[in-house]
Amino acid sequence: MTSEVEQPTAMSEALGYEQARDELIEVVRRLEAGGTTLEESLALWERGEELAEVCRRRLDGARARLDAALAEEADPEDGASGADGGGA
């Protein structure tokens, strides 16, 4: 019972960013609305933490892909595709 929230479950990892974000929004709404038992609130909070981690990982992955693409564009030796308007 020490690291239940640290790693998202395989089912959570299968979610796309938008799905995880939408479910997280719903979890927050339910927590803010109240009316749940302590156990239900704790379960919702744990699920929210898991979903937030999925979102963080998806965003980190997207950021890494963008950084890699921008690095390729910035490397003039890598992108020699004749876009400089070369010759007559």
UniProtKB/Swiss-Prot annotation:
Region (Disordered): 69-88
Places the protein is found: Cytoplasm
Keyword Cytoplasm: yes
Root EC class: hydrolase
Residues in the signal sequence: none
UniProt-recorded Gene Ontology molecular function terms: exodeoxyribonuclease VII activity
Keywords: Cytoplasm, Exonuclease, Hydrolase, Nuclease
Nuclease is among the record's keywords: yes
GO BP terms: DNA catabolic process
Enzyme Commission number(s) from the entry: 3.1.11.6
GO cellular component: cytosol; exodeoxyribonuclease VII complex
Reaction(s) catalysed (UniProt annotation): Exonucleolytic cleavage in either 5'- to 3'- or 3'- to 5'-direction to yield nucleoside 5'-phosphates
Pfam families: Exonuc_VII_S (PF02609)
Superkingdom in the source lineage: Bacteria
InterPro entries with a match to the protein in the record: Exonuc_VII_S, Exonuc_VII_ssu_sf
Xref: NCBIfam families: PRK00977.1-3, xseB
Subunit structure, as described in the record: Heterooligomer composed of large and small subunits.
General function of this protein: Bidirectionally degrades single-stranded DNA into large acid-insoluble oligonucleotides, which are then degraded further into small acid-soluble oligonucleotides.
Family assignment from sequence similarity: Belongs to the XseB family.
Protein name in the entry: Exodeoxyribonuclease 7 small subunit
Organism of provenance: Streptomyces coelicolor (strain ATCC BAA-471 / A3(2) / M145)
Gene coding for it: xseB
